[in-house]
C-alpha cells in the first residue's frame, strides 16, 4: 500500500496525456482518477517547508541590568516571561534566571546573618541585667552608635563604589549591622522581657507572611513608589509632631496611631524591597546589588520590630 502510494505520488503530472498524444489517441482512454496527495505534498506550500509550522512573534530574552541598558532608564529586569513563547527563549534566558536565583540566595544568607547578630544583641541586653544597667547608665554609646549607623547607611545607600566592591561592602555592612543591633538592643532593654519576646514573634510572623505573599502575588508593589513616598513623608512629619509634643505632654493614643502607621508603612516597604529582588517586576535590583538588597530588607524588619515594640511593649518598672 505504501509502495503504491509512493508510485502515484512520484509520478510526474501530465505523463499520461503525453503518452496518449504520442500514440495518436485522443479521449479514447478512460481518465484515471488522481490519487490523494501525500503528507509531504499536503504540508508543503509557499514559503513553508515540509514539517514546519509558522513562527509566532519572537520572544525577547531577559537581560540583567549589567548586560543590558534599558532605554527607558529603569534598571534591572523587565517584563518576565511572555506567555506562550517559552520555546523561543535562548540559553541566556535560563542562565539569567540562575543568576537571579543565586542573587536572591546571597541576599537572604546575608540577611539571616544580620538578623542572628541583632537577635543575639537584643537577647543580651534583655536578659543580662549587668549589660542592661550599663547601657542605660551610659546613653553616650547610644548616640555614638546612631552616628555610626547614619554614616554607614549613607555610604552604602548613596555610594555605589564601596557598596559593590569586596571587601569594603562587607566591612561597611558589618559596622552598620553592629551599630543598628546596639540601637535595637538598647531600645529593647527599656521594655519588659515578655513584651520583647512577643514582639519578636509577631515580627517574625508578619515578615514571613509578607515575604511569601510578595513572591506569590501578581500585584506589583514596585510600581507604587509614589504612594510609599507619601506614606513615608506622613510618618516623618508625624514623628516630628510627636517629638515636639513629647516634652510638654505625652499623648498615648497619638503615639499608638504613630506606631500603627509606622508598622504599616514599613510592612509595605518590606513587600516593595522583596519584589525588587525578584526581577520580574517594573523595577528590580542588579545582581551586583546584593548588599543593598540585604540592607533594605534588614532595615524594614528592624523598623517593624521597633514599632511593634512601641505598640505592644510594656515598660519595665
Swiss-Prot record:
Q: When the coding gene is removed by deletion, what phenotypic consequences does the entry describe?
A: Mice show reduced cerebellar size and internal granular layer (IGL) thickness in early developmental stages, delayed Purkinje Cell (PC) development, with an abnormal morphology and reduced cellular density, increased caspase-8 and caspase-3 activity in PCs and higher sensitivity to Fas-mediated apoptosis.
GO annotation (BP), single? cerebellum development
- Glycosylation-annotated residues: 192
One Pfam family recorded for the sequence? Bax1-I
Principal place where this protein is found? membrane
Q: Where are the transmembrane segments?
A: 107-127, 139-159, 166-186, 195-215, 226-246, 252-272, 291-311
Task: Give the membrane topology.
Answer: Multi-pass membrane protein
* InterPro entries with a match to the protein in the record: Bax_inhibitor_1-related
Q: In which tissues is it expressed?
A: Brain. Highly expressed in cerebellum, also found in cortex, olfactory bulb, and hippocampus.
Could you tell me which residues belong to the region Disordered? 1-54
Database matches in CDD domains: LFG_like
Alphabetically ordered keywords of this record? Apoptosis, Cell membrane, Glycoprotein, Membrane, Postsynaptic cell membrane, Synapse, Transmembrane, Transmembrane helix
- Determine the domain of life of the protein's source: Eukaryota
Q: Where in the cell is it found?
A: Cell membrane; Membrane raft; Postsynaptic cell membrane
Is Hydrolase one of the keywords?
no
Give Gene Ontology CC terms.
endoplasmic reticulum; Golgi apparatus; Golgi membrane; membrane; membrane raft; postsynaptic membrane
Q: Is Membrane a UniProt keyword of this protein? A: yes
- PANTHER family in the cross-refs: BAX INHIBITOR-RELATED (PTHR23291), PROTEIN LIFEGUARD 2 (PTHR23291:SF18)
Q: What does this protein do?
A: Antiapoptotic protein which protects cells uniquely from Fas-induced apoptosis. Regulates Fas-mediated apoptosis in neurons by interfering with caspase-8 activation. Plays a role in cerebellar development by affecting cerebellar size, internal granular layer (IGL) thickness, and Purkinje cell (PC) development.
Partners and quaternary state?
Interacts with FAS/TNFRSF6 and BAX.
* The family this protein is said to belong to: Belongs to the BI1 family. LFG subfamily.
What is the protein name given in its UniProt record? Protein lifeguard 2
The organism's taxonomic lineage, starting at the top:
Eukaryota, Metazoa, Chordata, Craniata, Vertebrata
Amino acid at each position: 500500500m505504501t509502495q503504491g502510494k509512493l508510485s502515484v505520488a512520484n509520478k510526474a503530472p501530465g505523463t499520461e496525456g503525453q503518452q496518449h498524444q504520442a500514440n495518436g489517441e485522443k479521449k479514447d482512454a478512460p481518465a484515471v482518477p488522481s490519487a490523494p496527495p501525500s503528507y509531504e505534498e499536503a504540508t508543503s506550500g509557499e514559503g513553508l517547508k515540509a514539517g514546519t509550522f509558522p513562527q509566532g512573534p519572537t520572544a525577547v530574552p531577559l537581560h540583567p541590568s549589567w548586560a543590558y541598558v534599558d532605554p527607558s532608564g529603569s534598571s534591572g529586569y523587565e517584563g518576565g516571561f511572555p506567555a506562550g513563547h517559552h520555546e523561543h527563549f535562548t540559553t541566556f534566558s535560563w542562565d539569567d534566571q540562575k543568576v537571579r536565583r543565586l542573587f536572591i540566595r546571597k541576599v537572604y544568607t546575608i540577611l539571616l546573618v544580620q538578623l542572628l547578630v541583632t537577635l543575639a544583641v537584643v537577647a543580651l541586653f534583655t536578659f543580662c541585667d549587668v549589660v542592661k544597667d550599663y547601657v542605660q547608665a551610659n546613653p553616650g554609646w547610644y548616640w555614638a552608635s546612631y552616628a555610626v549607623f547614619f554614616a554607614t547607611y549613607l555610604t552604602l545607600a548613596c555610594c555605589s563604589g564601596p557598596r559593590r566592591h569586596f571587601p569594603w561592602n562587607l566591612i561597611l555592612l558589618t559596622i552598620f549591622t553592629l551599630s543598628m543591633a546596639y540601637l535595637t538592643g538598647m531600645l529593647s532593654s527599656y521594655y519588659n522581657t515578655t513584651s520583647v519576646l512577643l514582639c519578636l514573634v509577631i515580627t517574625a510572623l508578619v515578615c514571613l507572611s509578607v515575604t511569601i505573599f510578595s513572591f506569590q502575588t501578581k500585584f506589583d508593589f514596585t510600581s507604587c513608589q509614589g504612594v510609599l513616598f507619601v506614606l513615608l513623608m506622613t510618618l516623618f512629619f508625624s514623628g516630628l509632631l510627636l517629638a515636639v509634643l513629647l516634652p510638654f505632654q505625652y499623648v498615648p493614643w497619638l503615639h499608638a496611631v504613630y506606631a500603627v502607621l509606622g508598622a504599616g508603612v514599613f510592612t509595605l516597604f518590606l513587600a516593595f524591597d522583596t519584589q525588587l529582588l525578584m526581577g520580574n517586576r517594573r523595577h528590580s535590583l542588579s545582581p551586583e546589588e546584593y548588599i543593598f538588597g540585604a540592607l533594605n530588607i534588614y532595615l524594614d524588619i528592624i523598623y517593624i520590630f521597633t514599632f511593634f515594640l512601641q505598640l505592644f511593649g510594656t515598660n519595665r518598672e
